[in-house]
From Swiss-Prot:
Cited CDD domains: Adenylsuccinate_lyase_1
Assigned protein family: Belongs to the lyase 1 family. Adenylosuccinate lyase subfamily.
Top-level taxonomy: Bacteria, Bacillati, Bacillota, Bacilli, Bacillales
Gene Ontology CC annotations of this record: cytosol
Pathway: Purine metabolism; AMP biosynthesis via de novo pathway; AMP from IMP: step 2/2; Purine metabolism; IMP biosynthesis via de novo pathway; 5-amino-1-(5-phospho-D-ribosyl)imidazole-4-carboxamide from 5-amino-1-(5-phospho-D-ribosyl)imidazole-4-carboxylate: step 2/2
EC number(s) reported in the record: 4.3.2.2
Record's keyword annotation contains Magnesium: no
PROSITE patterns linked to this entry: FUMARATE_LYASES
Name recorded for this polypeptide: Adenylosuccinate lyase
Species of provenance: Bacillus subtilis (strain 168)
Keywords recorded for this protein, A-Z: Lyase, Purine biosynthesis
EC class: lyase
Molecular function, one GO term: N6-(1,2-dicarboxyethyl)AMP AMP-lyase (fumarate-forming) activity
Length: 431
């Protein structure tokens, strides 16, 4: 991932240095397991633990000849050792090291993402409680529907992110799995104890069965979860973008002193952070499709997945780490304009209360069709003539003969629509 969208802690996980260090840890742990079984002398393993090292430039130099990165790595490590070098990679195949180390790196990345998600959920929760009763227009198909609150909108986001948090925990468990089962998964040249030992030391589970590789449905599921989280963030960001339009201006991203919105137009205050979220989500969703393409490998393995995963797994975790942190700050510092929300509610001249009038007429004994046919012409007239809907209702004898002035006034009270806000918040555990 390019530096612009990278945060140091996450990026550090995916450096060549950290990747090779993970490979080395798998190699040494495997030797420790062999020592427990009495195959490798414990003194040799002690020396390996103390002295085994690598030089990245040397690995790359060797790889020019071997055209195999793991062989280059093991040779470079062997050069740092004495007689005990013969135990490097003992009984292992390349993917025993690579796949197990990859899962270990993903575990490191997951620990960061989990904290990011939990922080984001908490930020949305506090913002929802702050705006629990901030009344605003609910829109369906982009058209004014009925009143809601900004707090309810945020509470919806909070509940969605709680689901994403649970999905992530499940995907985390599914991907934090290692395998050291040999060339085709039969443990022909490796004792299953070695796999169990290494995985336990790394905080991974051992795959119940594998071929030369871990099966890539795990990685596809993991990437799908990252993509869904990114898409939820995009969904929220698109909402902010819509509400920040000049003709709406119900919310606005924080605009810092000295910030510029346009090179040409000094007045511009654009929702660039939210727009950025949309672009980043597109990238992660694209990576998800690549992960799905990686599932059908040939027989017990091929390496068609390898080149893709070197890109998509680091990039996706780095990108989501960036998204979660940037959008958390956008929500936390979001400027909300309650007066604009109320002003926008009035722009449709009371049409948002049409259902209340409809139901009130039904309560007097009209059929639904009769009530609808009575109210709709008045609503259409309000649209077309830009006349307050309430005035037309109060002038319509078919309505006033059934509804008292007090009842009509009651139909146009937005507080009616907020009567269950407390109940919804309690149901969500946000009270």
């Amino acid at each position: 991932m390019i530096e612009r969208y990278s945060r140091p802690e996450m990026s550090a996980i995916w450096t060549d240095e950290n990747r090779f260090q993970a490979w080395l840890e798998v190699e040494i742990l495997a030797c420790e397991a062999w020592a427990e079984l009495g195959v490798i002398p414990k003194e040799d393993v002690k020396v390996m633990r103390e002295n085994a090292s690598f030089d990245i430039n040397r690995i790359l130099e060797i790889e020019k000849d071997t055209r195999h990165d793991v062989v280059a790595f093991t040779r470079a490590v062997s050069e740092s050792l004495g007689e005990e070098r013969k135990w490097v990679h003992y009984g292992l195949t390349s993917t025993d090291v690579v796949d197990t180390a990859l899962s270990y790196l993903l575990k490191q990345a997951n620990d960061i993402l989990l904290k990011d998600l939990e922080r984001f959920v908490d930020i949305i929760k506090e913002k929802a409680k702050e705006h629990k009763y901030t009344v605003m227009m609910g829109r369906t198909h982009g058209v004014h529907a009925e009143p809601t609150t900004f707090g309810l909108k945020l509470a919806l986001w909070h509940e969605e992110m709680k689901r994403n948090l649970e999905r992530f925990k499940q995907a985390k468990a599914g991907i934090e799995v290692g395998k050291i089962s040999g060339a085709v998964g039969t443990y022909a040249n490796i004792d299953p104890f070695v796999e169990q030992y290494v995985c336990e030391k790394l905080g991974l589970k051992a795959a119940p069965i594998s071929t030369q590789t871990l099966q890539r449905d795990r990685h596809a599921d993991y990437m799908a979860t990252l993509a869904l989280i990114a898409t939820s963030i995009e969904k929220f960001a698109v909402e902010i973008r819509g509400l920040q339009k000049s003709e709406t201006r119900e919310v606005e991203e924080f605009f810092a002193k000295g910030q510029k919105g346009s090179s040409a137009m000094p007045h511009k205050r654009n929702p660039i952070g939210s727009e950025n979220m949309t672009g980043m989500a597109r990238v992660i969703r694209g990576y998800m499709m690549t992960a799905y393409e990686n599932v059908p490998l040939w027989h017990e393995r091929d390496i068609s997945h390898s080149s893709a995963e070197r890109i998509i797994l680091p990039d996706a975790t780095i990108a989501l780490n960036y998204m979660l942190n940037r959008f958390s700050n956008i929500v936390k510092n979001l400027t909300v304009f309650p007066e604009n929300m109320k002003r926008n509610m009035d722009r449709t001249l009371g049409l948002i209360y049409s259902q209340r009038v409809l139901l009130a007429l039904i309560d007097t004994g009209l059929t639904r069709e009769e009530a609808y046919d009575t109210v709709q012409p008045k609503a259409m007239e309000a649209w077309e003539k830009q006349v307050p809907f309430r005035e037309l209702v109060e002038a319509e004898e078919k309505i006033t003969s059934r509804l008292s002035p007090e009842k009509i006034a009651d139909c146009f009270d937005y507080n009616y629509h907020l009567k269950n806000v407390d109940l919804i918040f309690e149901r969500l555990g946000l009270a």
